[in-house]
Amino acid sequence: MKTFSLKLLVFTLVLSFINCVAFAAADKPNIVIIWGDDIGQTNVSAYSMGVMGYRTPNIDRVAKEGMIFTDYYAEQSCTAGRSAFITGQNVFRTGLSKVGLPGADLGMRKEDPTIAELLKPLGYATGQFGKNHLGDKDEMLPTNHGFDEFYGNLYHLNAEEEPEHPDYPQNPEFRKKFGPRGVIHSWALPDGKQKIEDTGPLTRKRMQTVDDDV
C-alpha cells in the first residue's frame, strides 16, 4: 500500500499532464472514484484497520492495488467536496459551497473546468453515477461538462422524498417551480447537446432498490 503526501500528488499530476501525449498512445488504466456520503475516515478499514468492528474488503482492495491518500482539503459540505474534486478549484472561485434548492441558479458554470473534460482528449469514456449536488438545471448536469453519461439524483439525501410529507404544499404551481426533479439519466450527444430522461422521484420505496438501477 502506497501513502502519498499532497505535495507528491501535485508533483505527480504535473508530470502526468506534461507527458499526456505519451500516455495517449499507451494503454490507459481505468479510473474509479468512489465518494462516500456522511462517512468518516475510520468507516473504511483501509484507514482504520477495522477498529469500527467491521471491514470494507472491496474498498480495501482498491487501496492496496492502487493508491491511498491521507490529505484532502475542502469544506464539510457535499457540494464543496464534489466541486473541489471535479473542477480542481476552491469554493471561493466556484461559489459551490452549499447545496442549492431546486431551481436555484447555484451550480456548475460553463467556464468551470472538470476532470472529465481533461480526460476526454486522452481517449477516456466518462460517467458519473449517484448523487451529483452541483446544480439541478440542464446546463449544470455532468453530461454538459465533459461526462458521457450520468445517472443519479441532484440533491441532498432525502430531498426527493419531501413531497411525500403530509404537510408538503399541494399547489401544482408550487410543485412545478420549487419541487425537486426525479432521478436523472442523461447522455452527452455528438452535437454538444444532451439527451435527458427523468426516471421518476427517489421515493422512500425506491430508495430500497435504486442501487440496482445502475
Where are these regions (language model features)?
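Formylglycine-dependent sulfatase
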Residues: 2-7, 17-214
